[in-house]
């Protein structure tokens, strides 16, 4: 409907646009489109043999019997097989079948697209016709305008001297504005059956800049995947030079697609990237491959890299999952690189390990079975690939059942680890854990636990493992494990500052006999560290190869506060070993003495604006901070800051490489300084010095990398510029600056 309450600014803007948009007026017209509730639709339905009959209504109707011309005046509505027309005046020549409509015209097709015009000439089928000063608003988004448009019986629209945009043409106040981008063309053809728009003699307009000529092309509407060129990227860095990325997507089927992406560099040979993905009724998979030829450095340690001859280099990344039945599924992933620096040199990934897995699983309410295989490729400097284990196979079976008022879980597990240049291990065990949970009349939650396990190991080449405590004994070994525990929680609830608080003291007693831990190898329980998440665990080692065999008492408390718009959760605790026998836990883990270190966690959340988590570990003797970890997020979706700080000061022996101390700072943030503009940045800084790592050569402030950028994003375009700097050399992945430009347009590669 026509609005009479427009602001003066809107009126001025409309006047300004009127002068420049006389040929292709993309602004909305002051007329409501006909709807399915129009009066014409409430007329008596046509008889089955009159399916082609036109229904209409009007304020007045004139009929000239001599010329057989019908003239409908005042808010005319016509309907025929899903096509609806609204106009001020309609003249219908029944002899020739010619229909001419004028004044506030709006035509809606069965797909929901609405066409506006000054005048329209139709056949009496309402299927084809010619429109002057045409505007088409597509149901699936976007609009087209033309000096003249023609519609054919199959629904195809042909527009001459036309323009197209998927962008909004009004600001939040309803005032008209130029779209962020549009395409003008000598001819635009819209095929509703294909959901595509075809352009001939086109020009690309962006933010009012001089237009760029375009070749003949087409693009999809409605957000469906269609073949075509995707959004390009531009990047400049020290090693590869200027990079142009121009992906092209091939829609092979409704559920299959292939994307070919050439990466063209100014300083090195091009690289090709291909990604194939398919979705089926039972699952999906995706595989990506990169390939090029370039020089690489096999020496990752020296300051001055040494180059080899040119070599084929590449990377494969794939993932798949299929649900074979309601209970059975198969999944897998593959990540393999030709060498250790390829991913970093071409800015693909900075992961230091690549995992390849395959798994067959069965899951039902009380049973779990998995057959899994693992392969790990190391990307780390001075980490021989031959020492990386190949886990094939790993079988894990678990069964839950009710027993004696409690819950019994049975488990059987086997694992074979093979190394090409290291220790080989085969392991099998069967275990059972029974838990009985009860609530007392005073509100205490009491849990009784019994655990038993029988292990069998077979180990070869133990002397190839450098850390003696990880080796175990050569050959076949067996081990029996048993433990019992009682865990008591006593929650107290009350009011606090207009909200509620809950204080829960907790005490746990665990008893376990001496276990032959060092007789078997340690493959999966090396990175042991006391923290709040494992304080009350039955076994505070991470894996199965080591089990904490001392009897101990663990005590602590949880405190939570819930206020309007805010929550606070805190936990703190410590353990005391009841037996005096020596422990296998390394010094520095917080568990090596009879009294453990004190660990805790505090989490503060204020609505969706503030989230702060602090984890800590305090030395039991002088309360020195052995672990200090803070993760904070403050802000909204558009403007926020994220900070992470970690300092591990545990004084662990240097030969235990899985538990090295370090200190680092991570910062990231985004600031929206205008409606569509934002600036962002992130950095990682290594703060490690000899206080944390005696072997460190760092001065305590070594930036690893940083990233700073600016981005514009509205409803139909995303444009960004990013500067990234890497500070560390690794072979041919050199330090230096890189610059990235990104451009993504709605319906054009986005």
Residue ranges and their predicted role:
Residues 1-3, 63-66, 749-750:
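Short, intrinsically disordered, low-complexity terminal/loop segments
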Residues 24-161, 182-190, 195-197, 260:
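N-terminal amphipathic/hydrophobic interface segments
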Residues 116-121, 126-130, 136-183, 191-750:
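Outer-membrane beta-barrel proteins and related beta-barrel translocases across Gram-negative bacteria
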Residues 2-22:
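Gram-negative bacterial Sec-dependent N-terminal signal peptides
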Residues 12-13, 50, 79, 177:
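Generic anion/oxyanion-binding catalytic loop in active/binding sites
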Residues 11, 15, 57-61, 486:
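Short, Lys/Arg-rich amphipathic segments at extreme N-termini
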């Amino acid at each position: 409907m026509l609005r009479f309450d427009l602001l003066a600014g809107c009126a001025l803007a409309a006047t300004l646009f009127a002068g420049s948009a006389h040929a292709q007026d993309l602004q909305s017209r002051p007329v409501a489109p006909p709807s399915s509730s129009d009066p014409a639709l409430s007329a008596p339905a046509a008889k089955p043999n009159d399916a082609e009959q036109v229904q209409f209504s009007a304020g007045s109707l004139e009929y000239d019997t001599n010329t057989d011309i019908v003239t409908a005046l005042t808010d005319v509505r016509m309907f025929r097989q899903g096509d609806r027309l609204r106009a001020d005046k309609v003249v219908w020549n029944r002899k020739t079948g010619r229909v001419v409509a004028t004044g506030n015209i709006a035509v809606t097709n069965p797909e929901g697209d609405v066409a506006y015009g000054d005048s329209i000439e139709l056949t009496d089928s309402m299927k084809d016709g010619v429109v002057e000063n045409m505007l088409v608003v597509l149901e699936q988004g976007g609009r087209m305008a033309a000096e003249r448009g023609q519609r054919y019986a199959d629904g195809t629209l042909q527009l001459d001297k036309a323009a197209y945009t998927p962008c909004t043409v009004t600001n939040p106040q309803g005032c008209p504005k130029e779209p962020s981008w549009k395409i003008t063309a000598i001819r635009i053809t819209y095929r509703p059956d294909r959901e595509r728009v075809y352009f001939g003699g086109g020009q690309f307009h962006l933010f009012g800049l001089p237009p760029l000529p375009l070749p003949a092309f087409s693009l999809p509407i409605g957000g469906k995947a269609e073949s075509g060129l995707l959004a390009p990227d531009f990047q400049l860095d020290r090693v590869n030079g200027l990079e142009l990325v121009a992906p092209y997507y091939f829609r092979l089927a409704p559920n299959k697609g292939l994307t070919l992406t050439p990466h063209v560099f100014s300083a090195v040979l091009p690289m090709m990237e291909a990604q194939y993905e398919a979705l089926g009724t039972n699952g999906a998979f995706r595989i990506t491959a990169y390939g090029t030829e370039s020089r690489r450095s096999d020496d990752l340690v020296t300051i001055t890299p040494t180059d080899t001859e040119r070599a084929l280099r590449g990377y494969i990344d794939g993932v798949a999952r299929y649900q074979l039945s309601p209970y059975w599924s198969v999944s897998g992933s593959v990540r393999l690189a030709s060498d250790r620096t390829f991913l970093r040199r071409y800015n693909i990934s900075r992961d230091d390990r690549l995992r390849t897995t395959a798994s067959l699983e069965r899951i039902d309410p009380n049973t779990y079975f998995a057959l899994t295989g693992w392969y790990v490729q190391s990307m780390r400097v001075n980490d021989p690939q031959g020492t990386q284990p190949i886990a094939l196979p790993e079988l894990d079976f678990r069964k839950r059942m009710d027993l004696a008022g409690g819950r019994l879980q049975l488990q059987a597990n086997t694992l074979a680890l093979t190394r090409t240049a290291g220790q080989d291990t085969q392991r099998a065990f069967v275990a059972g854990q029974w838990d009985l949970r009860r609530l007392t009349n005073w509100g205490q939650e009491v849990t009784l636990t019994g655990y038993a396990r029988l292990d069998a190991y077979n180990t070869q080449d133990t002397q190839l493992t450098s850390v003696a405590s990880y080796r175990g004994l050569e050959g076949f070994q067996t081990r029996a494990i048993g433990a019992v525990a009682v865990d008591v929680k006593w929650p107290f609830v009350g009011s606090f500052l207009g909200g509620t608080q809950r204080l829960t003291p907790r005490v746990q007693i665990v008893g376990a006999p001496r276990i032959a831990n060092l007789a078997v190898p340690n493959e999966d329980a090396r990175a042991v560290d006391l923290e709040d998440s494992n304080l009350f665990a039955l076994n505070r080692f991470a894996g199965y190869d080591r089990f904490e065999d001392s009897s101990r008492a663990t005590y602590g408390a949880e405190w939570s506060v819930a206020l309007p718009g805010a929550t606070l959760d805190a936990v703190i605790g410590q353990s005391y070993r009841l037996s005096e026998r020596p422990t296998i836990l390394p010094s520095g883990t917080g568990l090596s003495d009879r009294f453990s270190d004190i660990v805790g966690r505090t989490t503060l959340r204020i609505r969706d604006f503030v989230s702060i988590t602090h984890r800590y570990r305090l030395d039991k003797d002088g309360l020195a901070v052995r672990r200090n970890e803070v993760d904070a997020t403050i802000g909204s979706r558009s403007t926020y800051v994220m900070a992470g700080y970690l300092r591990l000061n545990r004084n662990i022996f240097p030969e235990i490489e899985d538990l090295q101390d370090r200190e680092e700072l991570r910062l990231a943030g985004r600031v929206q300084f205008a409606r569509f503009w934002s600036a962002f940045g992130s950095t990682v800084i290594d703060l490690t010095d000899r206080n944390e790592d005696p072997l460190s050569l760092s001065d305590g402030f070594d930036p690893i990398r940083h990233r700073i950028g600016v981005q514009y994003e509205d409803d139909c375009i995303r444009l960004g510029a990013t500067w990234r700097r890497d500070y560390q050399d690794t072979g041919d992945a050199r330090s230096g600056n890189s610059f990235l430009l990104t451009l993504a347009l709605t319906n054009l590669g986005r």
